[in-house]
């Protein structure tokens, strides 16, 4: 059961623009809307999607477009001694073959783009250069080495098979914990010990805080300890990643049609990598077949096909295959936690200590270093009243696919760590797990509650949430169910996990309403729908607030040319921040 939606809308300074007062204002507005408020609305997207009329990347072929296929590394780590494309160019239908040398000559920047993450003693996040096509070394299996563009996909695949790459294999390390051991192969010379950043930013004075926590642990009656593995995973969305790149020679501009979580953020990042102005590239996204964090930022393939479109003068289309996606899509998780909880003789929580290491992969991915640092640690101490927390995290390079956000992005790891160590505390103290939790819940009278991490909970009633969860789960009836299962040779377990996470962390959001004439209204948002009913939810809010017909509203999204302020559909924040911005625009329209 989750208390997230009810109690944690304003848990950090990241989401201060959408706090409880804002949401109360929205709720007050809703009470004054039309009579249709609260009535069931059929999703306007459903008819189109169920009839197969949704437009995805593959549904918008461009005239005279070429097919792209990538040559990928079969090695975990290797030096590229040479790349011979002569045979590939002789394949019927092959138009061009690009290598890392071509991308170097194009002068593009690194795909590793990340906001600053401070380390210990003034250290900073190490971000090695990540090319669109590898030119001197490959750092993980599946890394892009060459791009073949041809008249057909079959010809492009034949051309890729004809590319000869001479590799010299090098020592590699793929295990997270092995990467930080003495003597492990070093991926990057400026990242000793394979440490991208040694983060202790959960406290403004980490050294003093660490000493205080150590003192409490040394005198604690009980210390519960658990070591936890957070397994690496791959997203496998229904629609794989894909894009079509076009180049307009007359205007020296690009158009990238791509399945993304936000056209504007994709446009801005891609322009920065290609070292062109934002006005020189347009990014559009229509329907998206699943994203979950996977499709937020640019990938090597997008930069490569954009350059190929310019070089060939023709649109270039690429769609990932399933096996290809497993080797090239951003992965997630792959981290390890040592967690300790200090308790007094009565079972009161005194201090929490976490030592966390998380794999970045071979490069730094889109906000990948935020996952095991800010995202994870700001969810502590969950619903528990813990006065002292020492949370430290090391981001580590390994010869694996880059990791990036996926469904929760660090927040589930925080809840897992908390609840596992609380259960261990119940075991070693002999206190009932539920009673131990009740004893240590943050009181409903303690709000606003500032955590040792520095975030503030604006409200909450965790005891009530716990009671409701136990009732819904029929906790008291578990023993009987377990006994019945045992008779049938089955195992049955039960547990408690309260997920309390900060959300709504995108930096800025906006909305625009235009009135072209008559009763029609055009609502333009930067937000990208990936299955969240945006075309239904946002127009309905506007219709109810303005007292107009829902059918008269046209909803626009997924086009960087609209120039609406905003980020992308990330961080569980779209409904809250977009509804907030929509209400503000509505208020402006009403009062002006």
Predicted regions and their residues:
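Single conserved hydrophobic/aromatic residue that forms the stacking wall/gate
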Residues: 1-22, 579-592
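Flexible, low-hydrophobicity surface segments
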Residues: 21-198, 223-226
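Glycine-rich loop/linker segments at domain edges
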Residues: 45-48, 114-128, 198-243, 334-420, ...
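Alpha-helical support elements that line or immediately flank enzyme active sites
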Residues: 70-104, 147-167, 243-312, 369-379, ...
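Short, surface-exposed loop/turn segments at secondary-structure boundaries that line and modulate
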Residues: 98-143, 177-189, 265, 283-304, ...
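Beta-strand segments within the central parallel beta-sheet cores of soluble alpha/beta enzyme folds
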Residues: 100, 279-286, 313-323, 350-355, ...
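Phosphate/diphosphate-binding loops
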Residues: 151-152, 310-361, 578, 582, ...
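Accessory "access/gating" subregions that flank catalytic or transport cores
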Residues: 213, 217-220, 224-234, 438-514
């Amino acid at each position: 059961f989750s208390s997230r939606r009810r109690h944690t809308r304003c848990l950090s300074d990241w989401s201060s623009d959408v706090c409880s007062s804002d949401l109360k204002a929205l709720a007050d507005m809703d009470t004054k809307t039309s009579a249709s408020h609260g009535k069931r609305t059929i999703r306007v997207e459903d008819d189109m999607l169920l009839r197969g009329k949704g437009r995805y990347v593959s549904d918008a072929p461009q005239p005279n477009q070429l097919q792209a296929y990538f040559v990928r590394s079969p090695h975990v780590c290797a030096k590229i001694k040479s790349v011979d494309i002569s045979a590939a160019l002789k394949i019927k239908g092959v138009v061009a073959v690009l290598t890392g040398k071509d991308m170097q000559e194009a002068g593009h920047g690194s795909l590793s783009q990340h906001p600053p993450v401070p380390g210990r003693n003034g250290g900073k996040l190490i971000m090695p250069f990540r090319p669109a096509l590898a030119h001197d070394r490959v750092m993980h299996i599946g890394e892009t080495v060459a791009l073949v563009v041809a008249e057909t996909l079959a010809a492009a695949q034949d051309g890729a098979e004809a590319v000869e790459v001479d590799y010299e294999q090098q020592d590699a390390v793929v295990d997270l914990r092995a990467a930080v051991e003495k003597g492990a192969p070093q991926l990057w010379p400026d990242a000793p010990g394979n440490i991208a950043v040694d983060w202790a930013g959960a406290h403004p004075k980490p050294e003093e805080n660490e000493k205080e926590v150590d003192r409490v642990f040394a005198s604690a009656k009980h210390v519960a300890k658990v070591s936890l593995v957070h397994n690496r995973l791959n997203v496998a969305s229904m629609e794989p990643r894909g894009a079509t790149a076009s180049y307009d020679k007359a205007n020296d501009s690009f158009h990238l049609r791509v399945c993304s979580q936000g056209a504007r953020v994709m446009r801005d990042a891609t322009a920065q990598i290609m070292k062109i102005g934002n006005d020189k590239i347009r990014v559009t996204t229509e329907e998206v077949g699943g994203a979950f964090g996977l499709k937020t930022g640019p990938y090597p393939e997008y930069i490569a096909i954009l350059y190929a479109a310019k070089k060939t003068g023709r649109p270039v289309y690429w769609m990932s295959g399933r096996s290809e996606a497993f080797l090239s899509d951003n992965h997630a998780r792959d981290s390890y936690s040592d967690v300790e909880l200090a308790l007094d003789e009565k079972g009161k929580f005194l201090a929490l200590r976490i030592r966390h290491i998380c794999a970045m992969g071979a490069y730094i991915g889109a906000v990948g270093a935020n996952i095991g640092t800010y995202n994870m640690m700001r969810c502590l101490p969950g619903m528990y009243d813990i006065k002292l927390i020492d949370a430290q995290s090391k981001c580590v390079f390994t010869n694996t696919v880059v990791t990036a956000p996926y469904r929760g992005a660090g927040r589930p790891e925080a809840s897992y760590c908390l609840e596992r160590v609380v259960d261990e505390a119940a075991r070693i103290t002999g206190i009932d797990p539920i009673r131990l939790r009740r004893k240590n819940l943050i009181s409903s009278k303690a709000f606003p509650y500032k955590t040792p991490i520095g975030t503030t909970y604006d409200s909450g009633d965790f005891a009530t949430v716990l009671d409701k969860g136990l009732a819904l789960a029929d906790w008291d009836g578990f023993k009987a169910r377990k006994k019945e299962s045992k008779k049938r040779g089955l195992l049955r377990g039960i547990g408690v996990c309260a997920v309390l996470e900060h959300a709504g962390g995108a930096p800025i959001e906006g909305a625009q309403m235009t009135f072209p004439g008559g009763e029609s209204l055009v609502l333009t948002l930067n937000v990208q729908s990936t299955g969240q009913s945006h075309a239904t939810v946002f127009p309905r809010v506007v219709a109810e607030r303005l007292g107009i017909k829902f059918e008269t509203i046209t909803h626009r999204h997924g086009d960087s040319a609209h120039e609406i302020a905003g980020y992308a559909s990330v961080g569980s924040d779209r409904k809250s921040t977009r509804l907030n911005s929509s209400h503000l625009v509505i208020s402006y329209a009403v009062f002006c």
